[in-house]
Amino acid sequence: MKASVIFSTYNSEEWLEKVIWGFSVQTTKDFEIIIADDGSREATKNLIEKYKTELDIPIIHVWQEDNGFQKSQILNKAILASTTDYLIFTDGDCIPRKDFVETHLNNRESGRFLSGGYFMLPMNISKFISREDVLSQKCFDVNWLTQNGLKKSFKNNKLSAKAFKAKLLNFLTPTKPSWNGHNASS
């Protein structure tokens, strides 16, 4: 096992399932999923148990009693439950592209952390995304997104940029390195 993917959840079964679908089609399977559950109801546990039996990726469910917003505490417990020495953090409502884990693993360096971006979709598009859209990766295609309501914008270029165009856009629109919970690893 090369990495542990850690994300939190709280009574958000619809989003949790979409995220799990995204991890089910990763280009590498050499990782475990650790779901840091900040006191969700039984429905969340049942969904996780279902996918533990359906997927060929280990899923560890770390749960704590609901004592208000205790995300940092449950994330710390999830880190302790990890069986690897490389941790990838994301959010419980961020659907990963199929190369998410592989990209983190390919770019890791000892003594460094990686910080990636994310693209926040309007709620109506997020709710519209189906299992098939995630498994086929259509939900990451700019044309599909605009056909389903995403407004045209210059920032949409980052969604489909490859090779030279991606490097150029990163140069033109740099961001400061920061540790964030939606796309970071160390």
Question: Can you say where each PLM-predicted feature lies in the sequence?
Answer:
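Glycine-rich, basic loop-to-helix element that forms the pyrophosphate-binding segment
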Residues: 65-82, 99
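A conserved acidic beta->alpha catalytic loop
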Residues: 22, 37-46, 68, 94
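Short, acidic, metal-binding catalytic loop of nucleotide-sugar glycosyltransferases
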Residues: 21-30
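Short aromatic/hydrophobic "clamp" motif used to bind/position activated sugar donors
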Residues: 87
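Acidic helix N-cap motif at the loop->helix transition within catalytic regions
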Residues: 17, 42-50, 99
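Conserved donor NDP-sugar-binding/catalytic core segment of glycosyltransferases
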Residues: 99-149
